[in-house]
Amino acid sequence: MANVALIGATGMVGSHILTSLLENPAIARVDTISRRTPSAAAAAPQTKLTTFVSDDTSRWAAQLSSLTPTPSIFISAFGTTRAAAGGFENQYKVEHGLNVEMARAARDAGTKVYVLISSGGANKASSFAYPRMKGEIEEDVKALGFERTVILRPGLISGQRQESRPAEAALRFIAGIAGKVHSGLKDGWAQDADVIARAAVNAGLKALDGDVPPGSEKLWILGGSDIIKYGGKK
């Protein structure tokens, strides 16, 4: 049985991750750390889910460090937008800074497996700001030296976001139509949020058990086809 800590539990992918964790019998306990109370918390058994809610993100690392028992898996689906942060510079400070700070706190606490929801275009050498930020987050958490690091790189994430992203919404609409015609028309470039979530949980549990593909013992990167494989319903 695994104990899991999760940040980003109120986002599109993170909310599905929380639901998947709560439904999975291999998960003994889930701790979420967030700015808002996750929607799944109302119906979740208190014996399995503990929530820590604070707008003051400077308190998050200390909360993670204090968890007992220590989470064996730490999952980050945390992210923000340029608009919500008030510009890319602030977005970088929040998204990169908090992800790395929380990963370091998890490592120092003794967490064995780190799971990150990244992006298909993540590349620290990219000339574009967003994929470069995602790539730098990946590089910085890899450098922390977890026993096992799992990185998911989804394409366009299909689903319903709470915040408005008009251009992305149009692409999600196209992905939805394509998926209804044939899943193969969508799966290569877009994945549903619930599929990504199940892939994150399943990959995290496999990594904890050491059941990873050859060559992925320390670092396991899942692209779109891997996400579909590990996130499909049984």
UniProtKB/Swiss-Prot annotation:
It comes from the Eukaryota. Transmembrane segments: none annotated. GO terms for biological process: import into nucleus. Its main location: mitochondrion. InterPro entries: Epimerase_deHydtase (IPR001509), NAD(P)-bd_dom_sf (IPR036291). Keywords: Membrane, Mitochondrion, Mitochondrion outer membrane, Transit peptide. GO terms for cellular component: cytoplasm; mitochondrial outer membrane. Gene3D superfamilies: NAD(P)-binding Rossmann-like Domain. It is a peripheral membrane protein. It is found in: Mitochondrion outer membrane. Belongs to the FMP52 family. This is Protein fmp52, mitochondrial. The gene is fmp52.
